[in-house]
Amino acid sequence: MNQIWLKVCAASDMQPGTIRRVNRVGAAPLAVYRVGDQFYATEDTCTHGIASLSEGTLDGDVIECPFHGGAFNVCTGMPASSPCTVPLGVFEVEVKEGEVYVAGEKK
């Protein structure tokens, strides 16, 4: 089965330390993070409480949820602090010809 890729933005549109929400038709939104020169993507909804992680605070490779302050590693989706215990789904990201693309399905 071929992977569907979603075009997010030009890589230059996201500075290091920024987050962008990606709305998908018929699916839950994603959060795309720029950590240094690398891009990562996870589910945008916190697994602990219904909050948008793209509205949280990115500190290095850790996103803090704006709802209860729990955190996740954006590279792996693994919880980084309580009260979060359930990992986030992560999505492959590629940069091609200066454009950021996110896979339509989880890794």
From Swiss-Prot:
Binds 1 [2Fe-2S] cluster per subunit. Optimum pH is between 7 and 7.5. Its cofactor is [2Fe-2S] cluster. SUPFAM superfamilies: ISP domain (SSF50022). Pfam families: Rieske. The keyword Metal-binding applies. One of its GO terms (biological process) is carbazole catabolic process. [2Fe-2S] cluster binds at C46, H48, C65, H68. PROSITE patterns: RIESKE. Keywords: 2Fe-2S, Dioxygenase, Iron, Iron-sulfur, Metal-binding, NAD, Oxidoreductase, Plasmid. GO terms for molecular function: 2 iron, 2 sulfur cluster binding; dioxygenase activity; ferredoxin hydrogenase activity; metal ion binding. Residues 6-102 form the Rieske domain. Disulfide bonds: none annotated. The keyword Membrane does not apply. Optimum temperature is 30 degrees Celsius. Monomer. Carbazole 1,9a-dioxygenase complex consists of a terminal oxygenase component CarAa, a ferredoxin reductase component CarAd and a ferredoxin component CarAc. Part of the multicomponent carbazole 1,9a-dioxygenase (CARDO), that converts carbazole (CAR) into 2-aminobiphenyl-2,3-diol. Acts as a mediator in the electron transfer from CarAd to CarAa. This is Ferredoxin CarAc.
